[in-house]
UniProtKB/Swiss-Prot annotation:
Domain of life: Bacteria
Gene name in the database record: regB
Job of this protein: Required for optimal exotoxin A production.
Organism: Pseudomonas aeruginosa (strain ATCC 15692 / DSM 22644 / CIP 104116 / JCM 14847 / LMG 12228 / 1C / PRS 101 / PAO1)
Name of the protein: Protein RegB
Length: 75
């Protein structure tokens, strides 16, 4: 899902913010957000690249600059 560049009620996520979460096997992983809020391009686990939405899925909990993804408005 892609969101507008500015979504009312959503926390601002500055470029270069750190996203912390878990991969599908329970290992801690980190990503750097290069643009936000949605469709942010994240580099993680050395050269691997993954595209995140604003937050995470139920199986991939994540926080962005310490804000739980569950605090984002439902869409």
């Amino acid at each position: 899902m892609r969101l507008p560049a500015v979504t009312p009620g959503w926390p601002a996520i500055p470029p270069g913010a750190t996203l912390g979460g878990f991969d599908g096997q329970g290992r801690r992983s980190w990503a750097t957000i290069s643009r936000a809020p949605s469709g942010a391009s994240c580099s993680r686990n050395r050269s691997a690249t993954r595209t995140y939405g604003w937050g995470a899925t139920a199986t991939t909990p994540a926080t962005i600059t310490g804000i739980p993804s569950t605090t984002a408005p439902a869409t």
